[in-house]
């Protein structure tokens, strides 16, 4: 059985301050105990430099704990007249290791289709970034028992355009749309059922990828439900939204992942 290192990725969305970065690293330096889990901070692009400075300033204090930096989005284009966009190379130069791709808010609010998501996935890997690919179903889709159908479609487009082995350097985050930012989380059993489906789907085309890829759960994860979620055999950590803006709650989630 593969030993998949748990991950806790904090997606600040359009929130946060440079002060939050400093506060988080102050607590990381004194509270994070080991490298048994990987911690990723995904602030708005304007704060990437603040997070990078904190990473550099606290390198010794972190004592080998795995704290990385990620972005919330990138352009599928390398350069050009795309006002307001940020390329993969720019993110790489800023110190990012990860980038969130296909978040439900991007798909819903900005019209990102599965084809665009697949292009962004490729752009991330082209520039040495590891994509955190988000997939998930809406409330009506779940009620219609179309959860697996929706997730399979979102996965298959990326596989068709990038190949299965592209997932050797990728993370998947299952984020049920009906749980994102609602305070209503999937039960551990619901999360495990979908994570197992995703792993099986990838295993059918590559047993190695299916066994080794990390699959995060995202959708109203809090310190009160994280232990049960992270204890599921196919749940490898969490993509955290609101709780990532509270340094005490986020640190608690990191500690839970390290003990999972």
Swiss-Prot record:
Main localisation: cytoplasm
Gene Ontology MF annotations: triose-phosphate isomerase activity
Keywords of the record: Cytoplasm, Gluconeogenesis, Glycolysis, Isomerase
Gene3D superfamilies linked to this entry: Aldolase class I
Places the protein is found: Cytoplasm
Cellular component annotations (GO), alphabetically ordered: cytosol
GO biological process assignments: gluconeogenesis; glyceraldehyde-3-phosphate biosynthetic process; glycerol catabolic process; glycolytic process
CDD domains: TIM
Reaction catalysed by this enzyme: D-glyceraldehyde 3-phosphate = dihydroxyacetone phosphate
Active-site residues, record numbering mapped to chain: 103 (electrophile), 175 (proton acceptor)
One Pfam family recorded for the sequence: TIM
E.C. code: 5.3.1.1
Keyword Cytoplasm on entry: yes
TM spans (from-to): none
Highest taxon of source: Bacteria
Entry annotated with the keyword Coiled coil: no
Pathway, per record: Carbohydrate biosynthesis; gluconeogenesis; Carbohydrate degradation; glycolysis; D-glyceraldehyde 3-phosphate from glycerone phosphate: step 1/1
Residues that, per the record, bind substrate: 11-13, 181, 220, 241-242
Purpose: Involved in the gluconeogenesis. Catalyzes stereospecifically the conversion of dihydroxyacetone phosphate (DHAP) to D-glyceraldehyde-3-phosphate (G3P).
Family to which the UniProt record says this protein belongs: Belongs to the triosephosphate isomerase family.
Subunit structure: Homodimer.
HAMAP family for the chain: TIM_B (MF_00147_B)
Protein name: Triosephosphate isomerase
Name of the gene encoding the protein in the UniProt record: tpiA
